[in-house]
Amino acid sequence: MSFISRSTTTFRRSISMKDYARVRWYSNSGKSLIENILSSKIAISKVYTLKKRIGLPESYPMKVLVQALIDKTVVQNPQYSNEKLWSIGKVFGDFYVLEYIKCKYPRLPEEAVHGMQNGWMGSKALSQLATIWGLEVQRREEGLQESFGKVLAKRADPEMLRKPGEIYKDEAARRAILAILGGVYLHQGFNDTKKFINDHILSKQLDPRTMLQLQWPRRQLSRLCKRLSLKEPVYRIIAETGRKSREPVFVIGAYSGHHLLGQGQASSLNLAEQQAAYNSLISYYIHSPPFRQLPSDYLEVNDGKIPKASEPYTSIPLVSHGQLVI
């Protein structure tokens, strides 16, 4: 987030203190920090409550969950922080979410794909998920006993610029969630990792239409038809009423040859044509072919062996460039 490094005083003062979270180096080692948490009844009860709240199985080690809540900049030794867990969780999270988007919306432009991926795996999205889980960032005035069960990070003064060794609230929450995800993969396996992502991350509803930049729909539809070797789109009136009244309604269809690409309804011919072109583009780009299995379903490994699938893998059906499915 490069904008945080701006030095304008007005900009720095306009951001609330709660939007920052800075990590300080703890004097005690990471090992003793984890041992203190595991040996405290208050601490272990809070961590266990979090474990049950997010649906982790009993076989998920408490030590790993505690370690996932200690950010990598809190302790110098990565063996006792969530640095390695976070790295593993990020790799599998990005891989599976990107695979899901590519299979569900194969025609979606790359900008929209990155937008949806950020909507599920970005700092803001995972920070909201942390709020749903009940995760909090440790406050500056809290002691170690009160911080058990929270992400170990402290708020920073908004007048201070970001320095090495500092992170912010959203990033701290994101690292903690991805570290928990990495622990799921290490101790539960690939199948449970995918289930965890489906239950907690992909369960958030995202509309792919909001990711598309369609500022000039008629021009963009014309270029799309040319790229797909289709006839130039023509706009025809399908129905109308009240042309000479105060509230006319026009229904316009966008045609490529004899094929209806889409239709729009508005109070003027120009707006109706724009809406018809927009709906045609939306229908093309968010086309979602049905599929039963993802390619990663055939990467499941049990005891070092890849089991035979119950049915042969069929690739995601893609429509050829000469067709338009509306």
UniProtKB/Swiss-Prot annotation:
Gene3D superfamilies: 3.30.160.20, Ribonuclease III domain. One of its GO terms (biological process) is mitochondrial translation. Component of the mitochondrial ribosome (mitoribosome), a dedicated translation machinery responsible for the synthesis of mitochondrial genome-encoded proteins, including at least some of the essential transmembrane subunits of the mitochondrial respiratory chain. The mitoribosomes are attached to the mitochondrial inner membrane and translation products are cotranslationally integrated into the membrane. Pfam families: dsrm, Ribonuclease_3. Transmembrane segments: none annotated. The gene is mrpl3. Keywords: Mitochondrion, Ribonucleoprotein, Ribosomal protein, RNA-binding, Transit peptide. It comes from the Eukaryota. PANTHER family: LARGE RIBOSOMAL SUBUNIT PROTEIN ML44, RIBONUCLEASE III. It is found in: Mitochondrion. Residues 1-26 form a transit peptide. Residues 216-286 form the DRBM domain. CDD domains: DSRM_MRPL3_like (cd19873), RIBOc (cd00593). Signal peptide: none annotated. One of its GO terms (molecular function) is double-stranded RNA binding. GO terms for cellular component: cytoplasm; mitochondrial large ribosomal subunit; mitochondrion. This is Large ribosomal subunit protein mL44. Component of the mitochondrial large ribosomal subunit (mt-LSU). Mature yeast 74S mitochondrial ribosomes consist of a small (37S) and a large (54S) subunit. The 37S small subunit contains a 15S ribosomal RNA (15S mt-rRNA) and at least 32 different proteins. The 54S large subunit contains a 21S rRNA (21S mt-rRNA) and at least 45 different proteins. mL44 forms a heterodimer with mL57 and stabilizes rRNA expansion segments 1/2 at a membrane-facing protuberance close to the point of attachment of the ribosome to the translocon in the membrane. Residues 47-189 form the RNase III domain. Belongs to the ribonuclease III family. Mitochondrion-specific ribosomal protein mL44 subfamily.
